[in-house]
Regions:
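A structural signal for multi-pass alpha-helical bundles of membrane permease subunits
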Residues: 2-280
Length: 280
């Protein structure tokens, strides 16, 4: 029996390794072509490593950053991502705490309503949302954060609610006896306990908001505000020609922050998801 288990473990390791290579290969392909001189790679050379004649060094990265206004797009992406994730964490952690501790029909209905929002396809509401956002002048980087709060609330509340069900209420009752108000109980007692779920939720929401293209395109004023995915999409050279090498260089730059964030905090994702789903 142990031999069979070891064999299946080895088979699973091989399968997962192959899937990992399959997942990483497109990124490697983009990276190697971002180092080639623009116009030197075609369908027959796209899979080949750069040679001495086609190697461009960092020129595509420098050109891409200066050409597409990378710094302004980076600023908009940072503002939208940081603000949206902060709002999601603050509002949804308080909501999850409330729904767990206030056990009545209204809280149960609200919980079902929030979880139901997770299964509603974005495509069902995107045109109505775009028109409403334009009517209410929500087409700015600050106002789109409110929309992200609405769409990100389902997953966040689900995770916070599941985790809070495993937290003994006696801790909060002891704080209440000591004279703490509900706000003090949340920020001084509950908030520190939520750290694993808080970090994992922040990572998941950050990856979503940072890489999102469709919602900013529908809501934001494209002429004034462009996030990094939007800037990459609208990257054009002379006469509307798509410059693939600088575009690929910008794609690599755009994914670096998310890779660093994920590699730094990946252990918290598993802890938070397990705490929010299994314990709940």
């Amino acid at each position: 029996m142990p031999k069979d288990k070891k064999m299946w473990d080895n088979i699973l390791t091989v399968i997962m390794s192959l899937l990992c290579l399959l997942w990483i290969y497109p990124i490697v392909l983009i990276l190697q072509n971002s180092l080639k001189i623009e116009g030197t790679f075609t369908t027959s050379t796209v899979f080949k490593l750069p040679t001495a004649e086609t190697f461009a060094g960092l020129s595509n990265y420098i050109y891409g950053v200066t050409k597409m206004g990378f710094l302004s797009s980076l600023g908009y992406s940072l503002v939208i991502t940081v603000t949206s994730v902060a709002l999601i964490l603050l509002c949804c952690s308080m909501t999850g705490w409330y729904l767990t501790r206030v056990n009545n029909k209204l809280s149960k209905f609200m919980n079902l309503l929030i979880v139901f929002s997770m299964v509603v396809p974005f495509q069902m509401v995107m045109f109505t949302l775009s028109k409403t956002a334009d009517t209410l002048n929500l087409n700015t980087p600050w106002n789109i954060c409110i929309i992200y709060l609405g769409f990100g609330a389902g997953l966040a509340v689900f995770m916070f609610t599941g985790f809070m069900k495993s937290v003994p209420i006696e801790i909060e009752e002891a704080a209440m006896i000591d004279g703490c108000s509900p706000i003090q109980i949340f920020f001084k007692v509950v908030f520190p306990i939520l750290k694993p779920t808080m970090i994992s939720t922040a990572i998941l929401e950050t990856m979503w908001v940072w890489n999102d293209y469709l919602l900013p395109t529908l809501v934001l004023d494209i002429k004034k505000y462009r996030t990094i995915p939007m800037a990459i999409q609208y990257f054009r050279g002379g006469y509307g020609r798509v410059e693939l090498a600088p575009m690929m260089a910008c794609i690599i730059i755009a994914i670096i922050p998310i890779i660093i964030l994920y590699m730094t905090c990946q252990k918290y994702i598993i802890e938070g998801v397990v705490a929010g789903a299994v314990k709940g």
